[in-house]
Amino acid sequence: MSKQIEFNEVARRSLERGVDKLADAVKVTLGPRGRHVVLAKAFGGPTVTNDGVSIAREIELEDPFENLGAQLVKSVATKTNDVAGDGTTTATVLAQAIVRGGLKNIAAGANPMALGIGINAAADKVVEALLAAAKPVEGKTSIAQVATVSSRDEEIGEMVGEALTRVGTDGVVTVEESSTLATELVITEGVQFDKGYLSPYFVTDLDAQKAVYEDALVLLYREKITSLPDFLPLLEKVAESGKPLLIIAEDVEGEVLSTLVVNSIRKTIKAVAVKAPFFGDRRKAFLDDLAVVTGGTVINSDVGLTLKDAGLDLLGSARRVVVSKDETTIVDGAGTDDDIKGRVAQLRREIENTDSDWDREKLEERLAKLAGGVAVIKVGAATETDLKERKFRVEDAVNAAKAAVAEGIVPGGGSALVQASTELADNLGLTGDEATGVKVVREALQAPLYWIASNAGLDGSVVTSKVAEQPKGHGFNAATLTYGDLLADGVVDPVKVTRSAVVNAASVARMILTTESAVVEKPAEENEQQTGHGHSH
């Protein structure tokens, strides 16, 4: 496949056109008065959204050189989304502004590498200023404010605040589509996993179709339970104790299952059996988690423990177990706080050390089950398009709220960046083109506020000048079109989101500015024409 190559200013200008096309599509959504973008889908109806990263992901440009620029700036949005979960539009607008200012100076003879050094130094200084200005987020009201700003919806903000307050910072908040019109919050206490009873005959609550037991013993077994003679001695000890039994094993088969069912129907023993969730190492790890939660021991032949010899001392216990057709919940296991804290600390270390996003996600789920709980926000809406748009906003709000709890908040609406730019007034003591790099970033930091104001129908330049004169913490509230104390008004952004936007925008802009050539594949038709059949005279 033959290639096309562009060099120097021509290459950089092509990249800039790509950056501009993507950024111009995204930045109309910035701020509380930002507009929506409609995305056509290959299947199904169109999606209407104001979520920067969702828009960026859809954009592929026809011109291959411009497309390179668009893909580079798309990576700013996705990276910011991965780290902070929100702030993708801010990051895109910043990258565009740094690229534009940088290219202007390169065309006037500035050295791209020196500019890059200045841009880096400026980004580091801005991050330092943001972290210094951060206020910790405490309490449901503060969390709800962050979520409200992110989602532009007070109801969503309140719900996210409630969810995170209930499950804690380690808890999991998942967002699902509801089959009704209402948006609701469902909190699960205790440890829950997606496996239900092996037989409907275990049900104790016929109306709810669930097996519900109080003060139950919990048997954790790593293999299949198939032999009744091996299992009977333990079953008899449980029957003598008079307590109900929850069995979690790889499987319970044959005569063991039928014996449990018959005894449950006759009420001679209260028991319910479920399969252990997951496979392989994940199943082993999850059973170990359950052992910590219930204060029991996982019985398995690897460590010399067999069912035949097991006593009640190896069983865990829980204040309440609820088993439905699809899921099992263990509430208030008998594990000690110290053991659970130790296990949580171990999982945190594993999360820090893993390189795999998938592994990290699964470890975080396990951590949430152990440490906090699980909250599900079920999003409802009148139409499918509306539902998708609302779900995007709820997901952004959850991510923003978590980021705020992690690193604190700064005044929102782009004001924190404008005020952080004053830290760059002396060009950080740098000279020449490095100082020019700092100046490029200083000017670019005005861009998010400029576009928030422009999208609200005001003159962006006038608003940025006014905000620069305001005291720290004060700025422009685009929702009410007033100036004032943004923290008091609840117009706040998570530091993590703003910081990630600055770092990622500076990084990608530097790459574009220091590009001297761009190589792309030649479009297929051109290749065919050149190697074409036939002959000319």
Swiss-Prot record:
Enzyme type, top EC level: isomerase
Superkingdom classification of source: Bacteria
InterPro entries the record matches: Cpn60/GroEL, Cpn60/GroEL/TCP-1, GroEL-like_apical_dom_sf, GROEL-like_equatorial_sf, TCP-1-like_intermed_sf
Which keywords are on file for this protein?
ATP-binding, Chaperone, Cytoplasm, Isomerase, Nucleotide-binding
Positions that bind ATP: 29-32, 86-90, 413, 477-479, 493
Cross-referenced Pfam families: Cpn60_TCP1
Cystine pairs: none
| Biological-process GO terms, alphabetical | protein refolding
Gene3D superfamilies per UniProt: GroEL, GroEL-like equatorial domain, TCP-1-like chaperonin intermediate domain
Quote one Gene Ontology molecular function term: isomerase activity
Keyword ATP-binding among record annotations: yes
Cellular localisation: Cytoplasm
Which PANTHER family does this entry report, sorted A to Z?
60 KDA HEAT SHOCK PROTEIN, MITOCHONDRIAL
- Family, similarity comment: Belongs to the chaperonin (HSP60) family.
Q: Extract the HAMAP family matched here.
A: CH60 (MF_00600)
Subunit record text: Forms a cylinder of 14 subunits composed of two heptameric rings stacked back-to-back. Interacts with the co-chaperonin GroES.
Q: What is this protein called?
A: Chaperonin GroEL 2
